[in-house]
Design a protein with these regions (language model features):
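A conserved ligand/cofactor-binding region detector
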Residues: 9-406
């Protein structure tokens, strides 16, 4: 069966020679105030291309955040290499929301260098409290679901548990509301307008996520019937990683977020015909999936977009989990021994039939073999029994958008 992983990650052929590079960075970044100042100066000039005449206060925040990210990445790489060299069961937490708030103070405390950073900033004329106020909240969730997801995530960090969290990155996550006696307005909260220094783009990690189309049958040489999902449209899920630090234990786990990309961002033939808007229509339609979380679902299009958002991040996450499993194992009957998936509320519940689809259609398992795997992998947390929180989708919408799952 063909793999759904688009870009194959290959080790360099001259791996022995590459060891020379890693030998050059064997030492850890300094954690004292002088080391922090040197890192900030480096990033001001080389990461942000600023000089003594153009650097502003916000650039100081960016240089500090990037300097801390350097130190997190050192521990992050150590953590991931430990998991690679000592394969153990991995826990994956799937949630549509994460209320992680501001990361600067948390990372300083978890790295154990809060006072060192305060001293470093005072040496260059700044107060840490002022710099902290320049950071915006990450727009990955602001409701009770996001708070509970983050609380669960925080409980895992001190235990050095090999845990991974996945979700979607939204360009304008939630709407900021302003109201008066006469009107109520909603405007996008574009929290990514000045970038997010903690994220690491993974341009090479792309997965196709399919929508619409139809299901057709085919038979193999042994007379077995296989169902194949064909036609429709595909969207690419691109990964962004955010290091999540444990409290002074040098364990840094990963929050992997997915952003929607069009397979073809620009149609040159349509552009040459003079239809400039249609030339980028596919790009706009694809990226709408990761524009705003919880779009208005009063109409059919809003409901369909919500289901798209949920299936999008679930499918990408499961494809990624399977790829990680196959890097060390080949027998899917042992999948549950190496993988545990926790579903946070109803939003990622489409993961159950999606894992069945991937195991049957992509990995070639028989239906009952796949079911034996699926029932041993998932855990589920439900935080409320309010009717509005228990989502339901019409069979007609599900069959139209995801014909293989209906």
């Amino acid at each position: 069966m063909p793999s759904s992983f688009l870009i194959v990650l290959k080790m360099p052929q001259n791996r022995h020679e590459m060891e020379k590079i890693w030998d050059l960075i064997a030492d850890y970044r300094r954690m004292d105030s002088e080391g922090l100042i040197h890192s900030m100066a480096h990033h001001l000039e080389f990461s942000q291309c600023k000089n003594r005449y153009t650097a502003e206060d916000f650039d100081v925040y960016r240089s500090l955040a990037t300097s801390l990210r350097d130190r997190l990445v050192e521990f992050w790489n150590d953590t991931q290499q430990t998991y690679q060299l000592n394969p153990i069961r991995q826990v994956y937490f799937l949630s549509l929301e994460y209320l992680i708030g501001r990361s600067l103070r948390n990372n300083l405390i978890n790295l154990g260098i809060y006072e060192e950073c305060r001293e470093a900033l005072r040496l260059i004329g700044y107060e840490l409290d002022e710099i902290e106020e320049m950071e915006v909240d990450a727009g990955l969730g602001n409701g009770g679901l996001g708070r509970l997801a983050s609380a669960s995530w925080i409980r895992w960090r001190p235990s050095k548990l090999p845990a991974h969290a996945t979700g979607s990155v939204m360009n304008s996550e939630f709407l900021s509301r302003s109201s008066n006696a006469e009107s109520r307005r909603e405007t996008p909260d574009n929290w990514l307008s000045q970038g997010y220094p903690w994220e690491i783009p993974r341009w090479e990690v792309l997965y196709p996520v399919q929508f619409f189309g139809y299901v057709q049958s085919r038979w193999d040489d042994e007379g077995r019937e296989w169902r194949q999902w064909v036609g429709g449209e595909s969207v690419l899920a691109m990964a962004y990683d955010v290091p999540i630090s444990g409290f002074q234990n040098r364990t840094v786990n990963n929050l992997r977020l997915w952003s929607a990309r069009a397979p073809r961002a620009f149609d040159f033939q349509i552009f040459n015909r003079g239809d400039y808007m249609q030339a980028v229509e596919e790009k706009q339609r694809s990226e709408t999936i990761s524009k705003v979380l919880y779009p208005n679902d009063q109409g059919f299009s809003g409901k369909e977009l919500r289901l798209k958002q949920q299936y999008f991040f679930v499918s990408a996450s499961l494809q990624d989990i399977i790829r990680r499993f196959k890097a060390h194992h080949s027998d899917f009957s042992t999948f549950h021994q190496w993988v545990a998936i926790q579903l946070n509320d109803t939003h990622p519940s489409i993961a159950v039939p999606e894992l069945m689809r991937l195991l049957v259609d992509e990995e070639g398992l028989e239906w009952f073999e796949a079911w034996e795997v699926v029932v041993q992998v998932f855990g589920y947390t439900n935080h409320t029994v309010l009717p509005e929180a228990l989502e339901r989708w019409s069979s007609s919408m599900l069959g139209h958008l995801l014909p293989r799952h209906s």
